[in-house]
Amino acid sequence: MKLYGEDNPAPNPRRVRIFLVEKGLTVEQERVPLRERAHKASQFLEKNSLGQVPVLELDDGSFLSESVSICRYLEGLHPEPRLFGSTPKAQATIDMWIRRIELQLMAPIAHIWRHTHPLTAGLLTQYKDFGESNRAHADRVFHWLDTELAGQAFIAGEAYSMADIIAQTTIEFGQAIGVPIPEDCGHVTAWLARVAGRPSATA
């Protein structure tokens, strides 16, 4: 297998790298430099017609894209430690939280990135007022998440899971582009310190 991705702070390839470290797996990796538009080159589009990373090339020559889908595939091959849950309830809870983080927090951070950051100015027509309007949305979500984390150690409960990987990469990407955790969200800050202290956090 070979993993095609990009260096930090790109959040989606990093999800898979963290997952691999948590699983104790080693996979050949190849960088796809996004700033050079390598992900839009015809050779890469043969691997993923959407021109996005990460992409996992399987031993049979086929390709998987989308970070969560790649990690689900790897979990199927290497079930332990279970990062998608070991019971139907745990699996559903982790899925719920993955969806919540992606839809409620990653979405506004992505809008801020695409519509306000200088690095994306040449890639699309930026609507800066729209981008800035998403800061209030992100702030509300951070405060909601802070309340949820008041009673549990990790995003989906008392065990570290794929939901924590999604949240960590999302929040740290937000920090890198100027969307910090609000100062009064102490539970989110404490949670991030816990996951950032894991060996996988350097991936």
Q: What is each PLM-predicted segment?
A:
Residues 1-128, 132:
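GST-like domain detector, emphasizing the conserved glutathione-binding G-site
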Residues 20, 200-201:
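Short beta-strand edge/turn micro-motifs at domain boundaries
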Residues 101-199:
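GST-like fold's C-terminal all-alpha helical module
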